[in-house]
Regions:
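Phosphate-/polyanion-interacting regions in eukaryotic proteins
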Residues: 58
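Exported/periplasmic ABC-transporter solute-binding proteins
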Residues: 2-42, 49-53, 61-70, 75, ...
Length: 232
């Protein structure tokens, strides 16, 4: 089983789900983490292009759609699982800036010495849509860092960025950081996460059963504890 989000989002949920599921079914789940997009060798599209052994992907729905269009994922296997939202974090021990209003959020961005965001959908949204819409693209570009191949939280924890932006589900279990909160509702972007079965899966029936389980109420608690909102 592949999971898409770097860091901890679906890995955390699956680590909660896997033991009971394995005991009940006798099916062993092997978890691997990988970015859902990007140029790194670890990114799911690049791993699938190398025909690595994969049965299921759990990833951003938009990225899953591309894999379906490329015939890498079975079209009718796609199931929506959880919603995620963008949060901001600072290094543990640092002052928590105010982002409760758009005015405060804007001031925090301008006052920050540095900020980091991922090279996945949340980071692309911030860099190419939100910051230009706020007329801050020029001011923020010089002090922004795009993170590839690891959690934005890890970069913040090392002190390499003052502010870090990523999905709440990706940030909430990273050590050494404190989550300030979600960015304001008026500029928030929901990311939908879905599951799909790989076209060359060696275990299609077992994969279908697991995807069905993840979309059932049995998995709701694990999904919520991972910072996601269940769809079903």
């Amino acid at each position: 089983l592949f999971r898409s989000a770097r860091g901890v989002s679906w890995l955390a949920a699956m680590q909660l789900v896997a033991p009971a599921y394995e005991e009940a079914t006798g099916v062993h789940i092997r978890l691997q983490e990988a970015p859902s997009m990007g140029r790194s060798p670890e990114a799911i599209p690049n791993r699938l292009a190398r025909r690595e052994s994969v049965d299921i992907v759990l990833m951003e729905d938009a990225a899953l759609s591309r894999l379906i269009n490329q015939s890498e994922v079975q079209k009718h296997s796609r199931v929506e699982l959880g919603k995620s939202f963008i949060a901001m974090a600072v290094r543990q021990g640092a002052v928590k800036p105010d982002i409760g209003t758009m005015k405060a959020f804007r001031s925090t961005l301008l006052d920050a010495q540095s900020l980091a965001y991922s090279d996945s959908s949340s980071g692309l949204y911030l860099a190419h849509l939100l910051f230009p819409r706020m007329k801050l693209a020029v001011q923020l570009k010089a002090k922004s860092k795009t993170v590839t191949g690891e959690s934005v939280g890890a970069v913040v924890a090392r002190g390499e960025a003052q502010l870090g932006f990523q999905q709440l589900s990706e940030l909430m279990r990273v050590p050494g950081i404190v989550i300030v909160g979600l960015i304001p509702d008026s500029v928030q972007k929901m990311t939908l996460y879905s599951a799909g079965i790989i076209s060359h899966s060696a275990h299609p029936s077992e994969s279908a059963a697991l995807v069905k389980y993840l979309a059932s109420p049995h998995a709701h608690d694990a999904i919520e504890r991972s910072g996601l909102i269940p769809v079903h």
